[in-house]
Swiss-Prot record:
Homodimer and heterodimers. This is CASP-like protein 4C2. The keyword Cell membrane applies. Belongs to the Casparian strip membrane proteins (CASP) family. It is found in: Cell membrane. One of its GO terms (cellular component) is plasma membrane. The keyword Zinc does not apply. Disulfide bonds: none annotated. InterPro entries: CASP_dom. The chain crosses the membrane at residues 32-52, 72-92, 104-124, 151-171. It comes from Populus trichocarpa (Western balsam poplar). Residues 1-31, 93-103, 172-186 are cytoplasmic. It comes from the Eukaryota.
Length: 186
């Protein structure tokens, strides 16, 4: 699948023969990206839900009373929404053999946003980890609150891991596009 953009010399791109094996490799690669994006979505959504439901009693601790926990919730919710969009784009690409946006925009959009949101998750979950460590001394009274906060943070780190792997794959697509003029080397 070559880029519809002309070569640097000004000529049009040539239509190259593409074997069935190449098409299958491309679909397999895109399916693998979809699996990692789905995992990032699931873990980020679960982390956001765990943090959102982390309140104990009316006079007790609430997650929204702590800036770091609000950051963990917001970052994971944003990444869950982004991952949902990227899953839809991946399904579109697998089913139609074409990207949602023009190919050059799609590869840079995917790579850039994967990087930004992966670092957002890493930053938020690191801040949440530091607060959770600080709260360990007070966890004798509110053990359930602390455990649920820890679970939300661990789920967020798992979301970061899968988003980071997706970022590696989207980086591979950027490099292939730069070298070949196509998002996948076939």
């Amino acid at each position: 699948m070559r880029s519809p953009q002309p070569h640097r010399s000004g000529g049009d791109t040539q239509q190259h023969f593409q074997s069935t094996v190449s098409v299958q490799k491309l679909k397999r690669f895109n399916s693998l990206i979809l699996v990692f994006r789905f995992a990032a979505f699931c873990f980020s959504l679960a982390s956001a839900v765990f943090m959102l439901t982390n309140s104990r009693g009316s006079d007790s601790l609430h997650w929204y009373n702590f800036d770091a926990f609000r950051y963990v919730f917001a970052a994971n919710a944003i990444v869950a929404i982004y991952s949902l969009f990227e899953m839809a784009a991946s399904v579109w690409e697998i089913s139609r053999n074409a990207t949602l946006f023009p190919e050059i925009c799609q590869v840079w959009f995917d790579f850039g946003h994967d990087q930004v949101f992966a670092y957002l998750l890493l930053s938020a979950n690191t801040a949440g980890t530091e607060l959770a460590r600080t709260l360990k001394d007070t966890c004798t009274d509110n053990k359930a609150f602390c455990v649920q906060s820890d679970i939300a943070i661990v789920l967020g780190f798992a979301g970061f891991l899968f988003l980071g792997i997706s970022s590696l794959f989207s980086g591979f697509r950027v490099v292939c596009f730069i070298i070949n003029g196509s998002r996948f080397y076939v």
